[in-house]
Regions:
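N-terminal small-domain helix-loop-helix segment of the aminotransferase-like
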Residues: 2-93, 100
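Short acidic capping loops at alpha-helix termini that bridge into adjacent secondary structure
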Residues: 34, 84-88, 108-111, 155, ...
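PLP-dependent aminotransferase-like
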Residues: 104-161
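Conserved PLP-binding catalytic core of the aspartate aminotransferase-like
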Residues: 283, 287-325
Length: 346
C-alpha cells in the first residue's frame, strides 16, 4: 500500500510504549482475584473525596463542552504556585505537554538530549516529530548533569531532565543543578519533569520554578496523576515563560482537557488533608519497603518518589512469577536494568 510506504521511516520504526497491565487483564489471564497493582505509581488512597464530590455534583453538565482555557483551574493554580496565569498550559496528562513542546520547538533532524534510563516517552515523542535523541547514561542511578551538558551539539534544541527520575526515584540537588545551568546555553530548551516533586523530602531539592527567567527557556512539567490520584482523568500542566506558552497554545487542541478532569483537579487542590494523608502513607510505605528489602538483603535505590527500584536478580522472571500470584510490578529491562523491578509504594 503506497500510503504506508510514504510514511517516514522515523514513524515506521517507532516502538510503541507498553503501559503496565491493568488488574482486570491480569486476573482474567491467570484466573485469580484480589490482585494488587504496584506497577504504575498510582496513589493507593485514590482521589480526594472533594474531587469525587465535585464530579458527582456536575455530571448533568456532561452534554456541554469543557472550558478550553481551564479558567478556574488556571486561576487557582496560579495563586497556589505564585506564577502568572499566562505562564500555565494544561494537557491530557503532562505527556501531552511534552508532545506539544516537541511539535512546537523541534524540527526534523533537530536533537534532544536526555538520560538513557529516564521516562521512555521522551525518546518516543522526539522520534515521532522527526527529531533525534542523544541519550546519556545515568551515574549512580541519577542524572549525570556534566555529561548531559557535554552531550549538547550544534543541533541540540531541547533537553529533558526528570527530577525525581523515573524509574530510579533519584534527584539531583541544588548546587549541581546551578553549576549545570552555568554550563548550558540559555538557548537550549530545558524540559524539567517534576511529576513526583511533592514526594521529595530532601531540603536541597531545586524547585525548577524558582529558576524561570526571560533569559532561560525552561518548561516545568507537573501532574495530577500521582499525589492527587487522578491518573484515570489524564490532567497535567506545564509552567514556562509566556512567550513559550503562547507558541505551544497554537498547536494545542481546543478542548484537550475534559470537564470532569478540571472539576476534580480544582477540588483536589483544595484538599490539604488528603494530600497530607497521601504523603504520610507514602513515607510509611517507603520506610517499610526499605526495611524489608534490607532484611532480605536486596539492594535498592534510595527513593525520593512514590516507587522504589529494587535489584532482584532476574527482573523479568521475578515480574512474571509475581504476576501469577496477583502482584503486578514493573519490569525495567527496557530501561537497561534487567536485574531490577520497580515497585510502587502501595
Amino acid at each position: 500500500m503506497k500510503t504506508v510506504e510514504q510514511v517516514p521511516e522515523y514513524i515506521r520504526s517507532l516502538i510503541p510504549y507498553e503501559p503496565g497491565k491493568p488488574i482486570e487483564e491480569v486476573e482474567r489471564e491467570y484466573g485469580i482475584s484480589n490482585s494488587v497493582k504496584l506497577a504504575s505509581n498510582e496513589n493507593p488512597l485514590g482521589p480526594s473525596p472533594k474531587a469525587l464530590a465535585a464530579m458527582r455534583s456536575k455530571l448533568e453538565q456532561l452534554n456541554l463542552y469543557p472550558d478550553g482555557d481551564c479558567f478556574y483551574l488556571r486561576q487557582a493554580l496560579s495563586k497556589k504556585l505564585g506564577v502568572a496565569a499566562e505562564t500555565l498550559i494544561f494537557g491530557n496528562g503532562s505527556n501531552e505537554i511534552i508532545e506539544l513542546a516537541a511539535r512546537t520547538f523541534l524540527r526534523p533532524g533537530d536533537e534532544a538530549v536526555m538520560a538513557e534510563q529516564a521516562f521512555v516517552v521522551y525518546q518516543l515523542i522526539v522520534q515521532a516529530v522527526g527529531g533525534r535523541s542523544r541519550a546519556v547514561p545515568l551515574k549512580n542511578f541519577t542524572h549525570d548533569l556534566p555529561a548531559l551538558a557535554a552531550a549538547v551539539s550544534t543541533r541540540t534544541r531541547m533537553m529533558f531532565l526528570a527530577n525525581p527520575n523515573n524509574p530510579t526515584g533519584t534527584i539531583f540537588r541544588r548546587a549541581e543543578w546551578e553549576r549545570f545551568l552555568g554550563q548550558l546555553s540559555p538557548d537550549i530548551l530545558l524540559i524539567v519533569d517534576e511529576a513526583y516533586f511533592e514526594y521529595v523530602r530532601d531540603a536541597d531539592y531545586p524547585d525548577s520554578l524558582r529558576y524561570h527567567t526571560h533569559e532561560r527557556a525552561i518548561i516545568t512539567l507537573r501532574t495530577f496523576s500521582k499525589l492527587y490520584g487522578l491518573a484515570g482523568l489524564r490532567i497535567g500542566y506545564g509552567v514556562a515563560p509566556q512567550e513559550l506558552i503562547s507558541l505551544m497554545q497554537r498547536v494545542r487542541q481546543p478542548f484537550n482537557v475534559n470537564a470532569p478532569a478540571q472539576w476534580a483537579a480544582l477540588a483536589a487542590l483544595d484538599d490539604a488533608e488528603h494530600v497530607k494523608r497521601s504523603l504520610d502513607a507514602n513515607r510509611r510505605g517507603l520506610e517499610f519497603l526499605q526495611k524489608e528489602f534490607t532484611r532480605l538483603r536486596l539492594e535498592f535505590v534510595p527513593s525520593q518518589a512514590n516507587f522504589i527500584l529494587v535489584r532482584v536478580g532476574r527482573g523479568q522472571e521475578v515480574f512474571q512469577r509475581l504476576l501469577k500470584q496477583g502482584v503486578i510490578v514493573r519490569p525495567t529491562t527496557g530501561y537497561r536494568f534487567p536485574e531490577h523491578v520497580r515497585v510502587t509504594i502501595g
